[in-house]
Amino acid sequence: MLVLVLGDLHIPHRCNTLPAKFKKLLVPGKIQHILCTGNLCTKESYDYLKTLAGDVHIVRGDFDENLNYPEQKVVTVGQFKIGLIHGHQVIPWGDMASLALLQRQLDVDILISGHTHKFEAFENENKFYINPGSATGAYSALESNITPSFVLMDIQASTVVTYVYQLIGDDVKVERIEYKKS
């Protein structure tokens, strides 16, 4: 089962569109679920995601026009409970102890957060944490030189194989990370 994880697009305020090389990779009909950390900013970005997969889950970012998106969401995909937040609620941003506390409160196997615009994926105390970064490479409050990135999770039974796509220069680099639920 393929799950696209992305966020912080900031279209059209900070970027015009997704990188063309990413759009070529994101083909309708291949992805079953989309988990978005927010800051899509417009309905057009949401509509684009709906063309890629029927099951789209979005949480509200601090720049989203649609205030109906929830602050946080828990989604079950296969054997995994996945928590989804934007990340501006985590103080300091991206802080491991704060993320771990939120993971315990939501009682999830995987916690997905954004806001920092920097890709991260790691295991801590048998739980998995993912920050997909910014799919467009939009600048953040702390940094202007952001590497565009998104994550594709392949969920099979009690294993998640995470593929990280990063646009470095003119090339899309892919890294593979595996997490097994214990």
From Swiss-Prot:
Signal sequence, renumbered to the chain: none
Superkingdom: Eukaryota
Keywords for this protein: Cytoplasm, Endosome, Membrane, Metal-binding, Protein transport, Transport, Zinc
Main location: cytoplasm
An annotated Gene Ontology molecular function: metal ion binding
Classification via InterPro entries: Calcineurin-like_PHP_lpxH, Metallo-depent_PP-like, Phosphodiesterase_MJ0936/Vps29, Vps29
Subcellular compartments: Cytoplasm; Membrane; Endosome membrane
A GO CC term assigned to this protein in UniProt: endosome
Membrane topology: Peripheral membrane protein
Stated role: Component of the commander complex that is essential for endosomal recycling of transmembrane cargos; the commander complex is composed of the CCC subcomplex and the retriever subcomplex. Component of the retriever complex, which is a heterotrimeric complex related to retromer cargo-selective complex (CSC) and essential for retromer-independent retrieval and recycling of numerous cargos. Component of the retromer cargo-selective complex (CSC).
Subunit structure, as described in the record: Component of the commander complex consisting of the CCC subcomplex and the retriever subcomplex. Component of the heterotrimeric retriever complex formed by vps26c, vps29 and vps35l; within the complex interacts with vps35l. Component of the heterotrimeric retromer cargo-selective complex (CSC), also described as vacuolar protein sorting subcomplex (VPS), formed by vps26 (vps26a or vps26b), vps29 and vps35. The CSC has a highly elongated structure with vps26 and vps29 binding independently at opposite distal ends of vps35 as central platform.
Family: Belongs to the VPS29 family.
Protein name: Vacuolar protein sorting-associated protein 29
Gene from which the chain derives: vps29
